[in-house]
UniProtKB/Swiss-Prot annotation:
Protein name, as recorded: Glutamine--tRNA ligase
Gene: glnS
Main subcellular location of this protein, as a coarse class: cytoplasm
Gene Ontology cellular component terms for the protein in this record: cytosol
GO molecular function: ATP binding; glutamine-tRNA ligase activity
Pfam families from the UniProt entry: tRNA-synt_1c, tRNA-synt_1c_C, tRNA-synt_1c_C2
Motif 'KMSKS' region, residue range(s) on this chain: 268-272
Amino acid sequence: MSETETRPTNFIRQIIDEDLKSGKHSSVHTRFPPEPNGYLHIGHAKSICLNFGIAQDYQGQCNLRFDDTNPEKEDIEYVESIKNDVKWLGFDWSGDIHYSSNYFDKLYDYAVELIEKGLAYVDELTSDQIREYRGSLKEPGKNSPYRDRSVEENLALFEQMRDGKFKEGTICLRAKIDMASSFIVMRDPVIYRIRFATHHQTGDKWCIYPMYDFTHCISDALEGITHSICTLEFQDNRRLYDWVLENITIDCQPHQYEFSRLNLEYTIMSKRKLNELVTEKLVNGWDDPRMPTVSGLRRRGFTAGSIREFCKRIGVTKQENMIEFGSLESCIRDDLNENAPRAMAVLEPVKVVIENYEEGKVETLNVANHPNKPEMGTREVPFTREIYIEQDDFREEANKKYKRLVLGKEVRLRGAYVIQANRIEKDEAGNITTIFCSYDTETLGKNPADGRKVKGVIHWVSADKAFPAEIRLYDRLFTVPNSAALEDFSESINPESLITKQGFVEPSLVTAEAEAGYQFERTGYFCIDNKDSTPEALVFNRTVGLRDTWEG
């Protein structure tokens, strides 16, 4: 995190302040515990900024722990991606990376302890039967017929589960709590199930795996976590979190705190639905710039600083709300307006021939990289007899409000001369193919000598020296603010979320590094694509427009 970024405040930090003041804790230890079954998204970034930010501000520690208890859905690819995302966002974890699988031996021992205390039993109900016996919010659950097995029988069966003597789905270990509890999570939850799957960390050592609610709290305690922070959907699970720790022999007793998850307009956060977008090829992979994944946002041109600023602006509360997508765009727009160098690119070109400019002549102009930051220097831009301008920057006729090039009138070329349109050529379909102009030789960097006013300024590139580029215009992935609420969210995909143009860019951009951000003058903010772009075939992604023009 940048030293210039201000320290936020929220209810969790207020709790921490009180805990330190009262002596409840002498230091702060948080953790970020993703499951490695997908790519991190902007919602995870909020949690990363919260947990790692707290550790930084309180000179504490934050662990990166992979909650890897579901081997069938997890992959080392996701582990590496998550590590890269955390570091790219500007954070680093304390000490070694932690894995819940590091604790499988201890978790097994704690499960045995619960059995020995008569607080866990091996159940042979099917998953459907367990669901049926659990009841509902209006009806209490009912006890499994296997609930009152002896401790000795449960220990023997659990050992046989570990030794692979049972098939998947035929038997499990459940906590013995209260089937009449008003909280369904406390109605004898499953804490171990059988999975014959190779684990990316432990291989084939285990064929039984602990459930999240059993693993999570014990992992926190073993790591000495002082403040276990998660989103509101785990609020009821706090009762199970506390129950497990209160009923095993363990020194540390962390406390769980909940905050509202991020809900962002015009996108979705569900891993299942994001995976559907990828598998159904509705997007081009997890790092598609339209995706809310950290890798997708990064590829689109969002900076780590802009994401951190967004997370700071939206704050941390217990109130569920929908954040405007424009808030995220505002953060990157502010960042790039301040820090991105300027460049010129023409997305829909039409040729301009300056008839009174010498053929073959190449003039090297020095153009400022940033209008308000002279320390960012200048770049060399070649000026030639033939240039490209945007088709939309010329009209044969126009009213006074149109401040661009009009037949018979003048306009200034950015960083160059004043030109006047004198005549045009069209093809058989009536499309303008060439605009013939003349230029005022005395207007480089100064106003016309006779005092006439030239109000408009347009961008351009040299037709001879510019480089062709594929320019991808990305927009919001969905046409409705809350697509997640729809029965079929895919029906609301924005057909114009990606529009590709074949344009031209000034030659200085050929050497730009991947992910480098620029303001294309008068067009928007763009970056070099970090996957497809090469010096021989440039690809630029639109990060955000110069202003918010979305109408929904």
